[in-house]
Amino acid sequence: MMSTKGITLFLCLLLLALATSVNGGQGTRRSRMTRALHGGRPSARYDAPYCSQEEVRECHDDCSGNPVRDACQCAYDPAGSPACDCYCVEPWRR
């Protein structure tokens, strides 16, 4: 039979695993409170919750002159970094 400490540890690890699997994906939308806690800026764009509209607009302007990679893809670090990472991609990869 497991001790009380063992059961508590097991439940904590189970909750941690569930929380990580729910919020760990890059495509998940985070709440305003979560973004505020991590220093992120809210945005209307689902694929770039940490990127401002100005950053996305600048990315589109930078990529518009590229003959192959003329679509802009903005992403964030799913580990919680508030950095906005924009780069040019082929339109079909968007």
Curated annotation (Swiss-Prot):
What superkingdom heads the lineage? Eukaryota
Q: Please report the PTM annotation for this entry.
A: Contains 4 disulfide bonds.
| Primary localization | secreted
Q: Where in the cell is it found?
A: Secreted
Molecular function GO labels:
ion channel regulator activity; toxin activity
Q: In which tissues is it expressed?
A: Expressed by the venom duct.
Q: Note whether Protein biosynthesis occurs among the keywords.
A: no
Q: Which UniProt keywords apply?
A: Disulfide bond, Ion channel impairing toxin, Neurotoxin, Secreted, Signal, Toxin
Q: Where is the signal peptide?
A: 1-24
Q: Name one GO cellular component term.
A: extracellular region
Domain comment? Answer: The cysteine framework is XXII (C-C-C-C-C-C-C-C).
Summarizing the function annotation, the protein's role is: Probable neurotoxin with unknown target. Possibly targets ion channels.
Q: What is this protein called?
A: Conotoxin Cal22a
Supply the source organism's classification. Answer: Eukaryota, Metazoa, Spiralia, Lophotrochozoa, Mollusca
